[in-house]
């Protein structure tokens, strides 16, 4: 119940983007961890699905006639891509770590603001939770006579039960809507306050003579440029690794095409 209430408050206050702030038992992932996980899942998915397509093609009549041996080349390509991913890992991680260091002060200030607002709205959340539990208890009490009547066979038609349940459900929905609207009204000032604080933080960054947003942008661009320079030799290694695969494919295809032409002319 507490998790549901906190999640609801989070939607009112800051949106789903700040949900990790309330998850005390699961520390948020760093940007690098999220990118790495997504990239790994994507690459593995493409690799497996691509290999399936290649296998299906080689098993077809046309694939057998061409005899391109794509699976052999596929394993070589996979090895090359995996090597590139391993080499790029430290470089990309360094980029994210540098960017996190540059924005550390801003993130700390925003965390303080969130903690303060969380403490201020906690009484409203507790009150909402209490009222919600009371509504669920009342709903359960109203359901008990229906359950008893059903067990005793007093309800001859299922339609009667459905009508009574529908009426109870509408009552609970209407009462819950009142509580939610009340909570939204109570939290609205704090939501506005949090947005204003964020705007103030960003404005201060613009006007400060130190770490301004322009500097953040410049530093991020510098880190990206460094990342690109470090990735160039690795991408060149990938290109060189692909050349034998492409040449093998080209030779196999031309050989198969020549063989097919000879058979067609006979």
From Swiss-Prot:
Highest taxon listed in the record's lineage: Eukaryota
Q: Which parts of the sequence carry Methionine sulfoxide? A: 110, 136
**Record has Zinc-finger as a keyword:** no
Tell me where the signal peptide lies: 1-18
Q: What's in the keyword line of the UniProt record?
A: Cholesterol metabolism, HDL, Lipid metabolism, Lipid transport, Lipoprotein, Oxidation, Palmitate, Phosphoprotein, Repeat, Secreted, Signal, Steroid metabolism, Sterol metabolism, Transport
GO MF, one term, reads: cholesterol binding
Its chief place of residence is: secreted
- What is a biological process (GO) this protein takes part in? negative regulation of inflammatory response
One Pfam family linked to the record? Apolipoprotein
| Cellular component aspect of the GO annotation | chylomicron; endocytic vesicle; extracellular vesicle; low-density lipoprotein particle; spherical high-density lipoprotein particle; very-low-density lipoprotein particle
Q: Where in the cell is it found?
A: Secreted
Q: Where is this region: 10 X approximate tandem repeats?
A: 68-266
Q: Does the record's keyword annotation contain Magnesium?
A: no
Describe where the sequence repeats fall, as residue ranges on this chain: 68-89, 90-111, 112-122, 123-144, 145-166, 167-188, 189-210, 211-232, 233-243, 244-266
Quote the PANTHER family the UniProt record gives: APOLIPOPROTEIN, APOLIPOPROTEIN A-I
Q: Which family does it belong to?
A: Belongs to the apolipoprotein A1/A4/E family.
Functional note: Participates in the reverse transport of cholesterol from tissues to the liver for excretion by promoting cholesterol efflux from tissues and by acting as a cofactor for the lecithin cholesterol acyltransferase (LCAT). As part of the SPAP complex, activates spermatozoa motility.
- What is its quaternary makeup? Homodimer. Interacts with APOA1BP and CLU. Component of a sperm activating protein complex (SPAP), consisting of APOA1, an immunoglobulin heavy chain, an immunoglobulin light chain and albumin. Interacts with NDRG1. Interacts with SCGB3A2. Interacts with NAXE and YJEFN3.
Question: What's this protein's name?
Answer: Apolipoprotein A-I
Which species expresses this protein natively?
Callithrix jacchus
